[in-house]
Design a protein with these regions (language model features):
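Hydrophobic faces of well-ordered beta-strands that scaffold small-molecule active sites
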Residues: 5-11, 35-37, 70-75, 113-115, ...
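An active-site-proximal structural segment forming one wall of the substrate-binding cleft
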Residues: 87-108, 112, 133-147
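Acidic/histidine-rich catalytic cores of soluble enzymes
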Residues: 6, 128, 135-232
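Active-site groove signature of glycoside hydrolases
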Residues: 108-124
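Active-site beta-loop-alpha junctions enriched in small/polar residues
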Residues: 10-14, 38-42, 75-78, 118-120, ...
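N-terminal pre-domain/capping segments
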Residues: 1-106, 176, 180, 197, ...
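Aromatic/hydrophobic pocket-lining residues that form the small-molecule binding cavity
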Residues: 20, 56, 94, 98, ...
Length: 281
């Protein structure tokens, strides 16, 4: 029977000490269809973009052995190295990370790359930072067009791009078939509560531009490490809207915070979200 949707697991939900084989095996065991790999701000993860052929081969062998693909990639390193940073050296590093991440995605069979919607993370957003951000995002779209990889803006925590509507503006300015939006259910919920607008109306502004959805729990003003179904995200309502807008790829975003039963949390995230997704399917 044809699957109606796919659900992926955020890599950082698992213990960092696990091998690729163990991570992929864990995701499969907990009921996922794919894994989302992370290129985060740590040197260890950023260095993945310089992987040699043998290392890539090892990952691909793990993928085939587990029977579970790496379906997407989150490039959160672009917080520390922001695309709109006033420092030219930081912007160059950001562009290197972006380009090499997209090239790595090609080599690993990853088709969707998520970039954070920040012009600058550490520092003040200005006309200048917004200008640099747009310039570099246009370059990223050209790289994505060349490599055939879909890139999506993640809606983030701060005012610059914390709603789908704001992401749409940049997608329209760049106007590329390969640059779309990868919203975060938790972040757009927090923005909706703070700014008193309807989260599903905001999500609907992205119609035709949504490539996947991060399913993440939040509380007002708290954006990370909130256990599933203990916060204020209306998953049923958001999934229902996302489904009606054609979203068929979902990733549960949660973190290993050192708990002994971290694996149970992953299985719970899968089961609770699949229950809602299966109602749509």
């Amino acid at each position: 029977m044809m699957k109606k949707y796919e659900i992926g697991l955020y890599e950082k939900a698992m213990r960092n000490t696990l091998s690729w084989s163990e991570k992929l095996g864990c995701a499969k065991e907990c009921g996922y269809d794919y894994m989302e790999m992370c290129i985060d701000v740590t040197d260890e993860k950023i260095n993945r973009i310089f992987m040699n052929t043998a290392e890539k081969k090892e990952i691909m062998e793990a993928v085939f052995q587990a029977g579970l693909p790496i379906g997407s990639m989150s490039v959160s390193a672009l917080t520390k190295y922001a695309l709109g940073d006033p420092d030219e050296e930081i912007r160059k590093k950001a562009m290197q990370i972006a380009e090499k991440s997209i090239e790595l995605a090609v080599d690993l069979g990853v088709r969707t790359v998520m970039i954070p919607g920040y012009d600058i993370y550490f520092g003040e957003s200005t006309i200048e930072t917004k200008k640099y951000f747009l310039e570099n995002v246009k370059k990223i779209a050209e790289i994505a067009e060349r490599e055939g990889i879909l890139v999506g803006f993640e809606t983030m925590e701060n005012n610059f791009m914390n709603t789908t509507g704001k992401a749409v503006q940049y997608v329209n300015m760049v106007d590329s078939a390969y640059l779309k939006i990868y919203p975060d259910a938790g972040n757009i919920t927090n923005a909706a509560v703070e700014n008193q607008h309807d989260v599903c109306e905001d999500l609907s502004l992205g119609k035709g531009k949504l490539i996947a959805l991060h399913l993440k729990e939040t509380k007002p003003g708290i954006f990370r490490e909130v256990p599933f179904l203990t916060g204020h995200v209306q998953f049923e309502k958001i999934i229902n809207t996302a489904w009606s807008l054609g979203v068929r790829r979902y990733v549960t975003e949660l973190w290993d915070v050192g708990k002994e039963n971290w694996k149970e949390d992953i299985c719970f995230a899968n089961q609770s979200m699949r229950t809602l997704l299966d109602r749509e399917a």
